[in-house]
Amino acid sequence: MANERTLSIIKPDAVAGNNIGAIYDRFEKSGLKIVAAKMMQLDDKKAGGFYAEHAERPFYNDLVSFMTSGPVLVSVLEGENAIATHRDIMGATNPKDAAEGTIRADFASSIDENAVHGSDSAESAAREISYFFNEEEVCARTR
């Protein structure tokens, strides 16, 4: 087992639904530690840059529009197998396919407004974390 970090974004729909505390509770109960967090209002440039790998996909403009529709809570989570653990807690991208008890099954309304984002690999996690946080903003949890 590896101690890892992953990026998590609580998206505008879940922030608007006052689900931050419930989502953080699930992270912590699964053994993930929050080592950085900030509430942000993304603009088109920041959201577009983050999702640049999807720029040619048909859903890109709608995704950027959604991600700029309200504040998001961007966090770095740390723990044993954090990437896989976080993805398991999130559930399938489409909430209709998400397992009962996952974040998306419980808080997402559609495949477009699906409550959370999580890194899908160690490489993505490193890139995504550095996109939103500098090293001084990520605090080691030793206690």
Swiss-Prot record:
Catalytic-site annotation from UniProt: H117 (pros-phosphohistidine intermediate)
EC number per UniProt: 2.7.4.6
Positions that bind ATP: K11, F59, R87, T93, R104, N114
Catalysed reaction, written as an equation: a 2'-deoxyribonucleoside 5'-diphosphate + ATP = a 2'-deoxyribonucleoside 5'-triphosphate + ADP; a ribonucleoside 5'-diphosphate + ATP = a ribonucleoside 5'-triphosphate + ADP
Keywords: ATP-binding, Cytoplasm, Kinase, Magnesium, Metal-binding, Nucleotide metabolism, Nucleotide-binding, Phosphoprotein, Transferase
The protein's required cofactors: Mg(2+)
Organism field: Psychrobacter cryohalolentis (strain ATCC BAA-1226 / DSM 17306 / VKM B-2378 / K5)
Matches recorded under SMART domains: NDK
Keyword Kinase in record: yes
Disulphide connectivity of cysteines: none
Physiological role: Major role in the synthesis of nucleoside triphosphates other than ATP. The ATP gamma phosphate is transferred to the NDP beta phosphate via a ping-pong mechanism, using a phosphorylated active-site intermediate.
Subunit structure: Homotetramer.
A Pfam family hit: NDK
Database matches in InterPro entries: NDK-like_dom, NDK-like_dom_sf, Nucleoside_diP_kinase
CDD domains recorded: NDPk_I
Name assigned to this protein: Nucleoside diphosphate kinase
Example of a GO cellular component annotation carried by this entry: cytoplasm
GO biological process: CTP biosynthetic process; GTP biosynthetic process; UTP biosynthetic process
Subcellular location: Cytoplasm
Homology family: Belongs to the NDK family.
GO-annotated molecular function: ATP binding; metal ion binding; nucleoside diphosphate kinase activity
Keyword Transferase: yes
